[in-house]
Every structure is written in structure tokens, then in C-alpha cells.
Amino acid sequence: MTRLAPVARLTQYAHGAGCASKIPPAELERVVAGLTGGGDDLVAGGADGDDAAVLRIEGGRAVVSTADFSTPVVDDAYDWGRVAAANALSDVYAIGGEPLMALNLLGWPRDLLPAELAREVLRGGRDVAALAGCAIAGGHSVDDPEPKYGMAVTGVADPDRLLRLDAGRPGVPLSLTKPLGVGVLNARHKATGQVFPQAVETMTALNADAGLAALERGIVCATDVTGFGLLGHLYKLARASGVTAVVDASAVRYLDGARTAVRHGFVPGGTRRNLSWVSPHTEFRRIAEEERLLLADAQISGGLLIAGEIPGAPVIGELVARGRRTLVVR
């Protein structure tokens, strides 16, 4: 099917780009403090901030539920739909589940952008959901000053074989399945219109195989790297697990052009807020500011951060016994 010819730069209709528009993590934690909870059958999704909620049901199974939506990260409507869908589905894979059904979540400025463009966004989401074997069963839409799109996803999992945020143990290596840098590249794209195909490719890639590989190897701890950056999500994992996480900065992969984007000042506000949040909990050993920003870069549809090793994913550090700081970057 031929794509709709662009009539507008979608990123110009949003104040921020994708997951970089998240409410700052420290502020969000204050807002939701004491408001989460559930019965004994809610085995994930409580105060630790797991990637998805998991509810145990009969027959040794569990229902997985999550929702994610964002503002545009790219100007191409179809690609934005693909990115947003992959990002929403990722939370199911990150906790060890299989997505079954999704509902579209769409906010659209009807007086500013044509309905045909919204259709392209939905088509992109549909195509990625189809790759995941996930049915789309309608959804919800609102007239919104800013375009927003994402999905509420329902899946299934074995409640006794989950990838949990709080299951990290000392002596386990850390692996990361995708390169970092989409946040700063998306910021450059928003400012200049320059397209970064490698960034689009990594953002639209599903984390299905990585999640399955982790389960097959008996791994029990993982999360995905999205709006809070590598350091933010690793901090949450290490804090929940009661360990210290050590990152070997030289082992972390970055997309082509990411360092240049930082040097030219294309750093999202969300990335800077991430770094401010984790810095008091992090021991940086001779790590330059540029490197710190990249490690905290706000991602969308990032890779899985796994406490363990799977084929094709570089080891970027390890978990050790809890020390003075929750994170160490060397």
C-alpha cells in the first residue's frame, strides 16, 4: 500500500518527543506514592513499578496488562504508528509475557491535521501488532491539541516464569539488546527534519525474540529501556532488587550520529531530567558529561535490559552486592 504523502511535520505539533515527554520520574513517584496495590493474585505491577501488571488467574496462567502512548517522535505518520505500537508491546515482552490483544489510544487535533494522517498512524500500529500476532480490537480516541498515539495491551504469561524488576541478584551480568541514542536523534529530527533510518529501524523492532530467549535460559530479571533512559531503568531495577548495578560505559552501543547530536546540543529535556534524578544515586568514575547524557538518554521502544546473557546482546555490566551507591558507571 502506498503511504500518504506528508502534509505536515508531525513532530512540530508536540511540545516534546515521545517518551522524553514523560512526567519526570521523581515527580511521578511522589504523585503515585501510596496509590498502588492489589490482592494476593496481583503478582506484578505494584509499588516497584514493574513494566506491566500481572494478575494470576485459574489454570496456572496470568493476565498481563499494560498501556503506553506518546507524542510523535518522527514526522512520518506510518512510522510513528509502528514505533508507538512496538513501544507499547515491549512492556509485555519485558515482563515475560505474550501479547494477545490491543486497544488503540488516539488523541488527534482534528482542526489541524487531516483524518487521513491519523489513519496512517493507525495503519502503522496495526502492521506491527500483526507481526506480533496481536489482534487489535478497537480502542478510544479524543480530540486533542497534540497528536498522541499508543496502545493498551493485554497478554498472557506463566506467573511462575516472569521477568521481574526485583529479582536481580549479585554476580549476574547485565545485557542490553538495542543500542542507545534514539532520544537525542529524535530531538535532532524534530529540530531539523533530518531523518535517521537506523533509529527508525531500531525503534520499530519488536523485543519478542529477546524476551523469549531470556525465558528459555531461565532468566528471571529484566526491564525495557524507555523514557527514563538506561540509567533510570537500571536504577529502578537495582533499587527494587536490593543490589548495586555496575555499568561498563565502553561496552554500551550507540546509534550512528548519537554522539554528534549531543555535541550539537540536541538533548531532550527528559534526558537531562533523567540524569538529574539518578546522579545522587550514581558513582561516576571519570565519565564525561556527554557520556552521562547518552546513558540517561530518554528512549522510546528501546531494548531489553536483562540480568543475564542471551545470544547477540552485549554484556554491559553486572550486578554486585549493594554498596554505597545504587549505580556505578566506570
Predicted feature descriptions by range:
Residues 55-56, 154, 177, 307-308, ...:
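Short beta-strand-to-turn element immediately C-terminal to the catalytic PLP-Schiff-base lysine
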Residues 152-162, 194-214, 289:
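Active-site glycine-rich loop that binds ribose-phosphate moieties when present
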Residues 57-74, 82, 98-191, 195, ...:
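Glycine-rich anion-binding loops of enzyme active sites
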Residues 1-16, 27-30, 110-135, 142-149, ...:
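Glycine-/charge-enriched secondary-structure boundary and capping motifs
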Residues 77-103, 120-131, 206-217, 230-237:
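Small-aliphatic-rich amphipathic alpha-helix that forms the alpha element of a beta-alpha
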Residues 42-44, 52-55, 90-93, 125-126, ...:
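A generic local secondary-structure boundary/capping motif
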Residues 53-65, 204-210, 275-285:
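Acidic-glycine-rich active-site phosphate/pyrophosphate-binding loop
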Residues 2-94, 134, 169-175, 314, ...:
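N-terminal glycine-rich phosphate/pyrophosphate-binding loops that anchor nucleotide-derived ligands
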